[in-house]
Amino acid sequence: MSQDVREVNFDGLVGPTHNYAGLAHGNVASMRHGGLTANPREAALQGLAKMKSLMEAGFAQGVLPPQQRPDLGALRDLGFTGDDAGVLAQAARQAPQLLRAVCSASSMWTANAATVTPSLDAPDGRVHFTAANLQSSFHRYLEPRTTARVLAAMFHDPAHFAHHPVLPATPTFSDEGAANHTRLCGDHDEPGVHLYVYGRQAFGGEHGPKRYPARQTLEASQAIARQHGLDDTRTVFAQQHPDAIDAGVFHNDVIAVGNGPVLLYHEMAFRDETATLEALRARMSTPLIPVRVPSEAISLEDAVATYLFNSQLLSNPDGSMTLVVPGECQENETVWRTIQDLLLGGNNPISEVLVKDVKQSMRNGGGPACLRLRVALAARERQALTGRVLLDEALHDDLAAWVERHYRDRLAPEDLADPLLVRESLTALDELTQLLGIGAVYPFQLN
């Protein structure tokens, strides 16, 4: 029975305060580019261009709005007082790193927004959402409350959508969302198996990274599977290789990407590669198609530098697949040759590679896959969405014009204390919620 299920990629709009603050420990690109001058307008338009090109290629594309930044409420909670200008000036003088954190536009990476289970797999026949607590870093810990509000506004109809509490924001339940989750299936309109990848086990775990933190726990992944009603026949929990995390693979989507029955991964993606593949094969009703990239072909360092595995793997109507890679892959001769010989030339469904320029995002450590949250939706569920959140040409043009009106083309670290930036951002976001038709979702609209 066909339900016309389509996977929709909901990309995050880059916010007006996009900057390079070097906030993310363990994210090599973010740390390397901290302090550079950013171009928020270019970043947002690059993201929109990627969305539009995929929409024009026939893929279903959605939009998620950015967060309210600077988060002056967070600064006030931390003891800074006075009017907005005074709070900004105090923070810039006394704690510049905190100011940079509350201005972060990191919500653009919607792969970390939530973990999603489609209605095909859920016992109650609804789409299930759990916004990620992102407790590993302060600048991202600020996101979940607004994220949950945005998701509840867009996916509002309780007949079709279920929203679960964010997990407790403690190291035990550290959760970074869909960046550590892949659904494997024969096709998007068939039941799937959920691969949850964790970096460490809070209770009783022995193996973990030594250099950089593991941001996802087994306990968090298990809790989300329970919330969504998934049993052992639909779930596989696999540990990410600690050496990969120490090489800068801070999420599993930096070292592996799955779509349909295909799992494209680096040989260092999982601590126990054989057991992971066997567990998937035992649960899947369709044969798994593993596409393994050995270290001899691409080193961990090149995988992190080019974000090959942070590509989007998308299904075409004829059963073939398109791989959407960042421009950095084409610039690296070794990686580009491997794409041609091993991926396009191999015995797998990958038949096309599209190269996208997302440099403004890449400098903060986010490739094409970081920028999107995958949600498989039946026709009735797409019709139940609130507002204008599925991209068409008119919405793209409206959003591009909105960016041109409101975004700066230059934002240096010293600009973050400018009180005008607050006013500009709130004006832009207020207009955006009207443009998208999702109602009041931001703190300044609710207070």
Curated annotation (Swiss-Prot):
<feature type="active site">
    <location>
        <position position="251"/>
    </location>
</feature>
<protein>
    <recommendedName>
        <fullName>N-succinylarginine dihydrolase</fullName>
        <ecNumber>3.5.3.23</ecNumber>
    </recommendedName>
</protein>
<dbReference type="Pfam" id="PF04996">
    <property type="entry name" value="AstB"/>
</dbReference>
<comment type="similarity">
    <text>Belongs to the succinylarginine dihydrolase family.</text>
</comment>
<dbReference type="InterPro" id="IPR037031">
    <property type="entry name" value="AstB_sf"/>
</dbReference>
<feature type="binding site">
    <location>
        <position position="215"/>
    </location>
    <ligand>
        <name>substrate</name>
    </ligand>
</feature>
<feature type="active site" description="Nucleophile">
    <location>
        <position position="370"/>
    </location>
</feature>
<dbReference type="GO" id="GO:0019545">
    <property type="term" value="P:arginine catabolic process to succinate"/>
</dbReference>
<keyword id="KW-0378">Hydrolase</keyword>
<feature type="binding site">
    <location>
        <position position="112"/>
    </location>
    <ligand>
        <name>substrate</name>
    </ligand>
</feature>
<dbReference type="InterPro" id="IPR007079">
    <property type="entry name" value="SuccinylArg_d-Hdrlase_AstB"/>
</dbReference>
<feature type="active site">
    <location>
        <position position="176"/>
    </location>
</feature>
<dbReference type="GO" id="GO:0009015">
    <property type="term" value="F:N-succinylarginine dihydrolase activity"/>
</dbReference>
<feature type="binding site">
    <location>
        <begin position="21"/>
        <end position="30"/>
    </location>
    <ligand>
        <name>substrate</name>
    </ligand>
</feature>
<comment type="subunit">
    <text>Homodimer.</text>
</comment>
<dbReference type="GO" id="GO:0019544">
    <property type="term" value="P:arginine catabolic process to glutamate"/>
</dbReference>
<feature type="binding site">
    <location>
        <position position="253"/>
    </location>
    <ligand>
        <name>substrate</name>
    </ligand>
</feature>
<feature type="binding site">
    <location>
        <position position="364"/>
    </location>
    <ligand>
        <name>substrate</name>
    </ligand>
</feature>
<keyword id="KW-0056">Arginine metabolism</keyword>
<feature type="binding site">
    <location>
        <begin position="139"/>
        <end position="140"/>
    </location>
    <ligand>
        <name>substrate</name>
    </ligand>
</feature>
<comment type="pathway">
    <text>Amino-acid degradation; L-arginine degradation via AST pathway; L-glutamate and succinate from L-arginine: step 2/5.</text>
</comment>
<comment type="function">
    <text>Catalyzes the hydrolysis of N(2)-succinylarginine into N(2)-succinylornithine, ammonia and CO(2).</text>
</comment>
